């Protein structure tokens, strides 16, 4: 991500925290909210909880992606399910924040995330994954690089990690999250643009773990030899045409991501 990218969007003359922007555009909010529940602003997010809800320290976090033009419908669906289950969740608060998180130059590990759901245990996570998958069948959204897609869903993803309660300060003053691995040791909660499990944690939502890729990386007839640049819009690669042996340049475009500020994707 470009340093200061979010701060540059908040004001025409000064660097300011992005959430302080005067006009973030149309707001996102659930269409129906049960009595007694209210949302709380947390940076660019709105967090929803209630008397029956509470955040576990860590677990299977669910991320739901959406196309910008379908975001309100997706939010209403996610909110309805979470309210009925009494599970806390959050969503991006406004259109500008959606465009920022999905922009070409935003952080790749965070891109694609529109809603985040925090189930208290694995059984609840499994039930929510199934309900969300069924309710959002037919919806499209960007692939969340830090996560694994749930079955054949195009919008529902999950990863194992901290729910935000445990962390420590680095020497440079920034904070890093911590999570307990399978043996109970505290380790860094790695938020990478690739799916990662702490040692000793097993994915309960797949019948068999996929084997790491071995051999050349192929895009049709082109064998990738080097990544030149990676962004939310897609990658740029040096490659070799396997039919002729000629060196070529391949540019990738990621669907529903790499947005510009009129909402056009890569």
Q: PLM features: what roles do these ranges have?
A:
Residues 54-71, 221-266:
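ATP-binding glycine-rich loop module of kinase domains
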Residues 108-115, 119, 123-130:
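Elongated alpha-helical scaffolds
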Residues 1-26, 167-227:
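Juxta-kinase regulatory segment immediately upstream of eukaryotic protein kinase catalytic domains
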Residues 44, 51-75, 91-110:
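Nucleic acid-processing catalytic cores of prokaryotic defense/repair systems
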């Amino acid at each position: 991500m470009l340093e200061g990218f979010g701060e540059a969007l908040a004001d025409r003359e000064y660097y300011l925290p992005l959430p302080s922007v005067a006009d973030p555009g149309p707001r996102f909010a659930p269409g129906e909210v049960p009595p007694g529940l209210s949302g709380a602003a947390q940076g660019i997010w709105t967090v929803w909880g209630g008397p029956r809800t509470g955040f576990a320290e860590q677990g299977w976090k669910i991320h739901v992606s959406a196309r910008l033009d379908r975001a309100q419908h997706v939010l209403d669906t996610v909110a309805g399910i979470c309210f009925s289950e009494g599970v806390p969740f959050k969503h991006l608060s406004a259109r500008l924040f959606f465009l920022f998180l999905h922009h070409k130059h935003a952080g790749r590990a965070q891109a694609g995330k529109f809603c985040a759901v925090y189930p208290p245990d694995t059984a609840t996570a499994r039930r929510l994954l199934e309900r969300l998958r069924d309710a959002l069948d037919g919806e499209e959204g960007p692939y969340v690089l830090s996560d694994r897609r749930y079955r054949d869903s195009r919008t529902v993803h999950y990863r194992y990690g901290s729910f935000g309660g445990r962390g420590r300060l680095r020497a440079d003053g920034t904070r890093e999250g911590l999570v307990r691995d399978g043996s109970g040791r505290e380790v860094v909660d790695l938020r990478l643009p690739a799916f990662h499990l702490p040692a000793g944690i097993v994915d309960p939502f797949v019948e068999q773990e996929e084997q790491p890729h071995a051999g050349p990386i192929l895009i049709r007839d082109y064998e990738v030899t080097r990544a030149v640049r990676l962004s939310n819009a897609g990658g740029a690669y040096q490659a070799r045409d396997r039919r002729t042996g000629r060196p070529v340049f391949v540019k990738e475009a990621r669907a529903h991501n790499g947005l510009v500020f009129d909402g056009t994707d890569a």
